[in-house]
Amino acid sequence: MKKLLLILCCITLLAACQKVVVEQEEPVFIPEPTELVVGTLYGPQIYFTSGQGDSGYDYEMAERFAKYLNLKLKMRAFANISELYAAMRSGEIDIIAAGLGDTPARREQFRVGPPLYRVDQVLVYRQGTPVPKNINSLNGEITVITDSSFVDTLTDLQKSNPDLVWNQEKDKDAEELLTMIAAGDIPYTIADSTSLDINRRFMPELREGLVLKKKQPVVWLLPANNSDKLMSQLLAFWHIEKRSGTLAHLNEKYFAHVKRFDYVDTRAFIRAIDNKLPKYQSTFEKYAGDIDWRKLAATAYQESHWNPNARSPTGVRGLMMLTLPTAKQVGIKNRLDPYQSIQGGAKYLNSMLERLPESIPDSQRMWFALASYNIGLGHVEDARKLAQTQGLNPSAWRDVKSVLPLLQKRKYYKKTRYGYARGNEAVHYVDSIRRYYDTLVWIDNQNMLLELKKENIQMAENLEQKTEAAQPQQP
């Protein structure tokens, strides 16, 4: 019996010493992202597409951020702010980059990135509409976009003005509301100052009224949860772009030149696009070379308002206002022949581009070339050297633009090689051409959208006809 108990004990001990294998679940593999999905809205300062590619302040920054992260950029445009919010909450997009202002309501829902630029919130009305003296007199007459920062502003104002009411549009964007103002369909709206400045080039009837909020930061929005890594990457990227001057460059590119506004000139330009441009457009396209033909056309308008017989007391003549020596240099015999003038002006402008230093980036070479076209390459080189002595970047248009007016002051031009120049006029000259160019691009895009709409309608009609033809005839 003792022997049997001993055997049983040994068996029990051996069993206890056996290795116990516990099956473990394999860790879930989460692949690294390959693309940055950015939610946005269409708008001239935010994101838009054209025959020249994608553009917009938010688009360019998103493109640079994706490159910084070594990811492929995917832009997703939504119909309204509400859809953007829903896409962020459902995880469809990584970031909202849509020109949205920093507000307490947005901070409650999302994480807010660093400021890209600042805007004023302004009341907008149509020329001829009574000028409002205060917000209290506009009960029920203001229309704004649902979920916009303007709703927050009006809500704050309502606390001290309980009777204040307004209308909200969910399915329209800022540009559509401004178009409705210009058409007289609604009396008042609220817009960002940058949006108003940009759209007044196409809708000169727009007028700026009361400033309801000053210097509101425009920011990107990130998900409220699980976005620590992305936020730290965005902050690091923002500091790099700020130090390198990218933010300042984009501000100058999209906003600086549109601040000057001339109602009469804008109306005249829009009329000239209809009445004069069609006669010369094919010639601009033919001789533009590496230049966007619309920049060449904008330059010609700045020079002569597309008047082939234009003359100046200084001796410049024709559509492109060429001097006699320049005409000889580019092989033009008759400066008053509009087609020869366009050919000569294009050739001369292209030569200016070729002669610029390679250090000037492609995105800014045209502005340097136009300034050279206006006051001469030598004076532009003087301005570049002057910028460098002041610790500025001689290859950045925003910096050279700031010192060009100094060439009119003896204190500065006496130290330059080429002396006095009307640098302030060169700045105005380039800014005007940029505004004209932007207007031509906008009108081109509108025409393209109109043609696309017509094609879609025609396709739908053709499909309907085919469907009807395919149906069996009833006996």
Curated annotation (Swiss-Prot):
Any single Gene Ontology cellular-component annotation: cell outer membrane
InterPro entries: Lysozyme-like_dom_sf, MltF, Solute-binding_3/MltF_N, Transglycosylase_SLT_dom_1
Pfam family of the protein (one): SBP_bac_3
Signal peptide: 1-15
Region span, Non-LT domain: 16-258
Superkingdom: Bacteria
SS bond list: none
GO molecular function, one term: peptidoglycan lytic transglycosylase activity
Reaction catalysis annotation: Exolytic cleavage of the (1->4)-beta-glycosidic linkage between N-acetylmuramic acid (MurNAc) and N-acetylglucosamine (GlcNAc) residues in peptidoglycan, from either the reducing or the non-reducing ends of the peptidoglycan chains, with concomitant formation of a 1,6-anhydrobond in the MurNAc residue
PROSITE patterns in UniProt: PROKAR_LIPOPROTEIN
Membrane topology: Peripheral membrane protein
Domains: entry comment: The N-terminal domain does not have lytic activity and probably modulates enzymatic activity. The C-terminal domain is the catalytic active domain.
PANTHER family: MEMBRANE-BOUND LYTIC MUREIN TRANSGLYCOSYLASE F
UniProt similarity note: In the N-terminal section; belongs to the bacterial solute-binding protein 3 family. In the C-terminal section; belongs to the transglycosylase Slt family.
NCBIfam families linked: PRK10859.1
Protein's recorded name: Membrane-bound lytic murein transglycosylase F
Species in which this protein is naturally found: Shewanella halifaxensis (strain HAW-EB4)
Encoding gene, per UniProt annotation: mltF
